[in-house]
Each structure stands twice: as structure tokens, then as C-alpha cells.
Curated annotation (Swiss-Prot):
A divalent metal cation binds at residues 167, 212, 267. Its EC number is 1.1.1.262. InterPro entries: PdxA (IPR037510), PdxA_fam (IPR005255). The gene is pdxA. GO terms for biological process: pyridoxal phosphate biosynthetic process; pyridoxine biosynthetic process. This is 4-hydroxythreonine-4-phosphate dehydrogenase. It comes from Yersinia pestis. Pfam families: PdxA (PF04166). PANTHER family: 4-HYDROXYTHREONINE-4-PHOSPHATE DEHYDROGENASE (PTHR30004:SF5). It catalyses: 4-(phosphooxy)-L-threonine + NAD(+) = 3-amino-2-oxopropyl phosphate + CO2 + NADH. Binds 1 divalent metal cation per subunit. Can use ions such as Zn(2+), Mg(2+) or Co(2+).
Length: 331
């Protein structure tokens, strides 16, 4: 094992988007950890000069101890772009480059070289246009680290929302919620709240699937047939679960002040509340991986690339949360 405790790997994502800008902006302050950016050094230097920001790159040395990152510098794990990058213009020729940065960073996190992986935004459509099947970061990292199940969670300072199902059409959601799937998701959520967030007795509040959580079977049977039995089994294993509660009831201060996390049954049940409450400050976290992974909660913002107007807030929050999670894991 390396002295990895103070070493994070960052993937800026789509090279024509704001990811490189944000990595360079992050580098303008001191960090208590080493920031290793997996990207094309020429891309970062060109973008830094377009942004008129100072940037020194230091080649990553796996066998050297981690050093705290000084303002104006980044450590680079180099991957070359295939074609010239024009800010704001997607090019299918660089799709393999993007996937290679993710693979390299993921492998380093799996091996323990890096204590955490923080991802910038990718453009899923252009990766798929290159003939590379790509659903998203979460699925890519799960597949590469041989995880059968991972859990997507978004968090702000005040609220954490995990999802029982992620990127599915609404029509497919009820069929995807089974006692077995809930058992896996809640076990991972409970475990990671303890090990990565340092919460000894997590309180998890669970949404029902249907309006009014099924109204006792008058508005859908999923609560009675699936959700309630699954929660009862998990309670017998010592997991603190409250619910299922109607989602419109659950997202009120009197419940949320006691919740360490909320489990929503589908993407748009839980995330609109969180995004309204903390837009620009939300972080995406993948639970269940053998390493810490946080991410910005925004897209590639192609129109802002190289303009100097991209907001670095979500990236800073994602980095700070990763550092906090590293400290919790080391305790």
C-alpha cells in the first residue's frame, strides 16, 4: 500500500466542457491533500492560459509520498486527447479519451493508490455516439470494480437522499423495486453511512412508492406487498428505518431534522426537493463501491467552457466531502 491517505484523483470529464476549467480553478487555492488530475496536460495548460490563470503541473509519482497541493499547481496523471479540443464543441474523436481517464482513475482508486475519486461532468451522448455503451459514471465504476449493486446518493450540508432505483423510465420503476433489491440498497446505505460518514446509528427515512404511500392498499399495493415486508426484515437486523411514509409528508422539517438519509423510490421523487434546497451545493456520491467516489451535480455546461464564468461551488463541495469521508474512513 502507498501513503495514499492524502491523495485524491480527479477526472475533469468532457474536455470541451467546464470540467478542465473547474480543475484549474480548484488549483488556485491550497489543499490539505494531493490533487492528482487524470487528463491531458496540454489541454489543462491551454485552458489555463485561456482563463488567464497560473498553473504548474507536476508529474504524478506513485512511489512518492503524497504532498499537500499548493495554490497554482496540480499533479497530473497523463492521458492524451486524440483530437484537438475546441472549448464548447463536442468531438466524438475524444470519447475514448474520456473513458480512458475514468478507467485509469478507477483502477488507481480500486488498488488503494488514491483515497478517493472525484468526477467532473461527462457528456454521455457523445460517448455513446462513439459506439461505447455508457449509461453513466455510477454504472461504469460499478462494472469496473465488479460491484453487483451500488447506490446513488445526493447530499447537501442539510440533506442526504439515496435512490432505490436510478436512471429508469417511470414505467419500469415498480417492477425494479423488489424485497431483494431493497435489502441490498438499504444494507449498503446503512453500512456506508456508518463507515464513510461516521454516523454510528443512522436513521433512514423511507418514502412509499405511491401517493399517500398506497393509502393502505387503495392506491397501489407495492407498499403492502414489497416495501413494508422488506423494511420489517431489515429492522430485525438492527437497521433503524422509519416508513414507508408518503413522500410529500416525509420532506418536511419535522421529519428531516431526524433523518440521516432519506431513501426515495425513484429519481424524480427525491431529487427535486434536494436540488431546490441546495442547488449548486449538492454532491453526487456512489455508495457500495470499494472506494470513495463523489461528483459534481451539474452537466458539462459547454457554453461556459473557457469563459471564466463557470461556478466551481459544486466541485469544491465534492472535494471537501471526499476529504471528510477519507477522514471518517481512517478513524
Amino acid at each position: 500500500m502507498h501513503n495514499h491517505n492524502n491523495r485524491l484523483v480527479i477526472t475533469p470529464g468532457e474536455p470541451a466542457g467546464v470540467g478542465p476549467d473547474l480543475a484549474i480553478t480548484l488549483a488556485q487555492q491550497d489543499w490539505p491533500v494531493e490533487l492528482v488530475v487524470c487528463a491531458d496536460p496540454a489541454l489543462l495548460l491551454a485552458r489555463a492560459s485561456q482563463l488567464n490563470l497560473p498553473l504548474q503541473l507536476r508529474e504524478y509519482q506513485a512511489d512518492q509520498p503524497a504532498i499537500a497541493q499548493q495554490a497554482g499547481s496540480l499533479t497530473i496523471l497523463p492521458v492524451k486527447t486524440a483530437v484537438n479540443v475546441v472549448p464548447g464543441k463536442l468531438d466524438v474523436g475524444n470519447s475514448h479519451y474520456v473513458v480512458e481517464t475514468l478507467a485509469k482513475a478507477c483502477d488507481g482508486a480500486i488498488s488503494g493508490e488514491f483515497a478517493a475519486l472525484v468526477t467532473g461532468p461527462v457528456q454521455k451522448s457523445i460517448i455513446n455516439d462513439a459506439g461505447i455503451p455508457f449509461i453513466g459514471h455510477t454504472e461504469f465504476f460499478a462494472d469496473r470494480s465488479h460491484c453487483q449493486r451500488v447506490v446513488m446518493m445526493l447530499a447537501t450540508e442539510e440533506l442526504r437522499v439515496a435512490l432505490a432505483t436510478t436512471h429508469l423510465p417511470l414505467l419500469a420503476v415498480p417492477g425494479a423495486i423488489t424485497q431483494a433489491s431493497l435489502h441490498e440498497v438499504i444494507t449498503i446505505l446503512d453500512n456506508d453511512l456508518k463507515t464513510k460518514f461516521g454516523i454510528t446509528q443512522p436513521q433512514i427515512y423511507v418514502c412509499g412508492l405511491n401517493p399517500h404511500a398506497g393509502e393502505g392498499g387503495h392506491m397501489g399495493h407495492e407498499e403492502i406487498d414489497t416495501i413494508i415486508p422488506a423494511l420489517n426484515t431489515l429492522r430485525q437486523q438492527g437497521i433503524n428505518l422509519i416508513g414507508p411514509l408518503p413522500a410529500d409528508t416525509l420532506f418536511q422539517p419535522k421529519y428531516l431534522q431526524h433523518a440521516d438519509a432519506v431513501l426515495a423510490m425513484y429519481h424524480d421523487q427525491g431529487l427535486p426537493v434536494l436540488k431546490y434546497q441546495g442547488f449548486g451545493r449538492a454532491v453526487n456520491i456512489t455508495l457500495g463501491l470499494p472506494f470513495i467516489r463523489t461528483s459534481v451535480d451539474h452537466g458539462t455546461a459547454l457554453e461556459l467552457a473557457a469563459t471564466g464564468t463557470a461556478d466551481v461551488g459544486s466541485f469544491i463541495t465534492a472535494l471537501n466531502l471526499a476529504i471528510k469521508m477519507i477522514n471518517n474512513s481512517n478513524e
